[in-house]
């Protein structure tokens, strides 16, 4: 009998830290399901979610201000373990009667923490003995007075209260960040909290997830037929195989060539599915429809929503040609939901609408099926490995549903698409040739509709600009710009400017996420 993968779960309340998604990844790596929600989530949701424990993330607020963020008071009435990290520790202290103030010495970066006084959270965990831990600190506020019933469990030379605990209530606070890799024993500490203190069983495994997803798809779809919007990427391809296992011939895949794909991508996708997967795939050439819909539109959010609406119109047109199509399946993943919905908060601003989340029309005639919307990208890839997806497909960099439309700043024109395709092809080809493709997690070119002065021979030129973007990331929620070799960038830049007549300048994007997003629009 399959274990219930959602029976034991952790709720992570997000106070805005750049590391919050890492907490979720670490908890899931332990084998326990968790969800992210904004700190102001309503009490009814928390009760219904019924977590085995709560983690309060760090955040940028100054906890001593009267209007700073606070944890929902209900979590202290649920009789479940709570772990506060950095800001989460500080607000827990204040809300339970303690006191925090500006630190005498701010701590940013590596620090050594000494654990003291027995606690189930830190007991026996150290780096080389003497109860010392190498950790990552990032704070200018510190707890100065413990709430009643709490005791000190960790300190540094600069921060006397670097950890506290109310062992009877299973409340814990850490001023350092156990979720980041710089804290060497961080995963061990989180596992101690999740597995031992919260007593969560490790049911969140790839095999269990696959079994649950296939079962749920069978129950949801029944004897009806389902249409899948197939992009050729990992996400929709994994959904295709899951649906094939669940409902077999009831599945029809529709690959929409919207004229915004990379060079020869449509043919490559059709060939891959014909050779590796026995699913029915219909190719729809809809370039004219998408270009007309995008005509004169220059706003990123509007472009995403236009793309989403156009896709749905195509899918509904195809559904009418087939029999008994009641469901539309998509490869929506958890980061799409988080960025589009603001982790279920009424206050959080949407970063960007994903075409398959925020871009869907309210008048959708088909019932939506999103089997992997709870999964991070690396979890989807693990499922793909077990399901037998081709290696080249699993290792292929993500490509956004709106395609090149959001890699062209402003209006989308055929001329811009053609230029961008050439530049992107050169960049990716050289990454492969120089054995660099698999050292980065996503790489692409961006077309900038601005012109820059250049020189060709003795002549002045005034043409467009291309930006190259490459990042390293685990879950695509945070990302570090890739330090590609200068000689390589020089090679790519020269090829682009020499081989594409309308490009006079190439730049390299050195923005990390946050504060930037991976895609430019």
UniProtKB/Swiss-Prot annotation:
Domain (GMPS ATP-PPase) ranges: 204-396
Oligomer and partners: Homodimer.
Name of the protein described by the UniProt record: GMP synthase [glutamine-hydrolyzing]
Organism, as annotated: Vesicomyosocius okutanii subsp. Calyptogena okutanii (strain HA)
InterPro entries membership: Class_I_gatase-like (IPR029062), GATASE (IPR017926), GMP_synth_C (IPR001674), GMP_synth_GATase (IPR004739), GMP_synthase (IPR022955), GMPS_ATP_PPase_dom (IPR025777), NAD/GMP_synthase (IPR022310), Rossmann-like_a/b/a_fold (IPR014729)
SUPFAM superfamilies with a match to the protein in the record: Adenine nucleotide alpha hydrolases-like (SSF52402), Class I glutamine amidotransferase-like (SSF52317), GMP synthetase C-terminal dimerisation domain (SSF54810)
Residues in Glutamine amidotransferase type-1 domain copies: 9-203
Active site: 86, 177, 179
EC number: 6.3.5.2
Chemical reaction(s) catalysed: XMP + L-glutamine + ATP + H2O = GMP + L-glutamate + AMP + diphosphate + 2 H(+)
GO terms for cellular component: cytosol
Lineage, broadest ranks: Bacteria, Pseudomonadati, Pseudomonadota, Gammaproteobacteria, Candidatus Pseudothioglobaceae
Pfam families referenced in this protein's UniProt entry, alphabetically: GATase, GMP_synt_C, NAD_synthase
Lipid biosynthesis recorded as keyword: no
Coiled coil: none
List of residues binding ATP: 231-237
Function: Catalyzes the synthesis of GMP from XMP.
Enzyme class: ligase
Gene for this chain: guaA
Pathway recorded for this protein: Purine metabolism; GMP biosynthesis; GMP from XMP (L-Gln route): step 1/1
Gene Ontology MF term list: ATP binding; GMP synthase activity
């Amino acid at each position: 009998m399959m274990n219930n993968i959602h029976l034991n779960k952790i709720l992570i309340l997000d106070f805005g830290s750049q590391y919050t998604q890492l907490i979720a990844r670490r908890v899931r790596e332990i084998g326990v399901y968790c969800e992210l929600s904004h700190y102001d989530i309503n009490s009814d949701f928390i009760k219904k979610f019924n977590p085995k424990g709560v983690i309060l993330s760090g955040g940028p607020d100054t906890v001593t201000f009267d209007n700073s963020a606070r944890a929902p008071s209900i979590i202290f009435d649920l009789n479940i373990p709570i772990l506060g990290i950095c800001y989460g520790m500080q607000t827990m202290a204040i809300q339970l009667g303690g006191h925090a103030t500006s630190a005498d010495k701010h701590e940013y970066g590596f620090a050594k923490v000494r654990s003291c006084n027995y606690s189930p959270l830190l007991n026996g965990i150290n780096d080389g003995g003497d109860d010392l831990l190498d950790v990552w600190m990032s704070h200018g506020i510190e707890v100065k007075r413990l709430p009643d019933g709490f005791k000190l469990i960790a300190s540094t030379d600069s921060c006397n209260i670097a950890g506290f605990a109310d062992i009877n209530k299973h409340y814990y606070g850490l001023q350092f960040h156990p979720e980041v890799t710089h804290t060497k024993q961080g995963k061990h500490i989180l596992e101690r909290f999740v597995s031992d203190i919260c007593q969560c069983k490790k049911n969140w495994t790839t095999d269990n997830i696959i079994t649950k997803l296939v079962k749920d798809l069978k129950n949801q779809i029944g004897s009806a037929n389902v249409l899948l919007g197939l992009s050729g990427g990992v996400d929709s391809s994994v959904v295709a195989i899951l649906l094939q296992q669940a409902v077999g011939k009831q599945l029809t895949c529709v690959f929409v060539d919207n004229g915004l794909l990379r060079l020869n991508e449509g043919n490559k996708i059709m060939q891959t599915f014909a050779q590796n997967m026995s699913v029915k795939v219909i190719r729809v050439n809809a370039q004219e429809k998408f270009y007309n819909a995008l005509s004169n539109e220059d706003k990123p959010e509007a472009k995403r929503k236009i793309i989403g609406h156009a896709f749905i119109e195509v899918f509904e047109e195809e559904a009418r040609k087939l029999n008994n199509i009641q469901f539309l399946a998509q490869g929506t993943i958890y980061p799409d939901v988080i960025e589009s919905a603001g982790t279920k908060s009424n206050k959080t601003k949407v970063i960007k609408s994903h075409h398959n989340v925020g871009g869907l029309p309210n008048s959708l005639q088909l019932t939506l099926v999103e089997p992997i919307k709870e999964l991070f990208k690396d979890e989807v890839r693990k499922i793909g490995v077990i399901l037998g997806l081709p290696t080249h497909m699993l290792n292929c960099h993500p490509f956004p549903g709106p395609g090149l439309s959001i890699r062209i700043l402003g209006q989308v024109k055929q001329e811009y698409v053609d230029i961008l395709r050439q530049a992107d092809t050169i960049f990716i080809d050289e990454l492969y040739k120089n054995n660099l493709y698999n050292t980065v997690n996503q790489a692409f070119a961006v077309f900038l509709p601005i012109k820059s002065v250049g020189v060709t021979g003795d002549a002045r030129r005034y043409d467009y600009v291309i930006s190259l973007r490459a990042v390293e990331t685990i879950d695509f929620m945070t990302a570090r710009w890739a330090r590609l070799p200068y000689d390589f960038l020089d090679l790519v830049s020269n090829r682009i400017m020499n081989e594409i007549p309308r490009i006079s300048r190439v730049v390299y994007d050195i923005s990390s996420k946050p504060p930037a997003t991976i895609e430019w629009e």
